[in-house]
Amino acid sequence: MINKRKLILTSFCTGLSLFSYNRILAQEAVKKTSSGKTLHNISSYRYQKWENHFKSIIDGAILSDTKSKCLHFWIGKNNFYKIYPTSVPLTPELTRTGYTKIIKKVVGPDWRPTESMRKRDPQLPEYMPPGPDNPLGTHALYLSWPNYRIHGTSDTRKIGRQSSSGCIGLYNEHIEEIFNLVKIGTPVRLI
């Protein structure tokens, strides 16, 4: 018969060692390459099958999951697939879901807050030119829904949080990578 104390102690030690191992992995979650590029941890995001959302990925496809705060990107016959952490809308009321597509790509986007955004925050400017303080970051993908975009951000604290007025935000280096791969007409789904 197994001694209850040994069983409890063994279970506790096993759990503690797994916890310690996960802490070590978490500490390694953000690394820098030799060129200084930051590598962000995406291991906590669940894999998605493109077939559950799109008919084809030949010209690319983007799925933004607002619950897990990540963006899935697929392209080509070889099933190129990447997951990126995102910022998502502040509230469900600001979140639009469904299918849309990319209608415009802009490097160095300017920004005009909507009337409702300025109502919520009267201190917002009417217009902001491209630049380091622009909340749209370095690149923007305009969607067929008015005023909705997938864009970069210079405020990296927003990534992984509910922090936008409806758009999906990415680290600037991630939006630049996607920007260079997608085409006008690429399908997008927000869930």
Protein language model regions, located:
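Exported/periplasmic cell-wall-interacting domains
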Residues: 57, 93, 97-98, 110-191
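Short, flexible active-site-adjacent loop segments at beta-strand->alpha-helix junctions, enriched
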Residues: 13, 68, 106, 147, ...
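N-terminal secretory signal peptides and thylakoid transit peptides that target proteins
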Residues: 1-15
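Short, cationic motifs built from Arg/Lys/His that form the positively charged side of catalytic pockets
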Residues: 4-5, 70, 169
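Cell wall/extracellular polymer interaction/catalysis modules
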Residues: 29-116, 127-132, 139
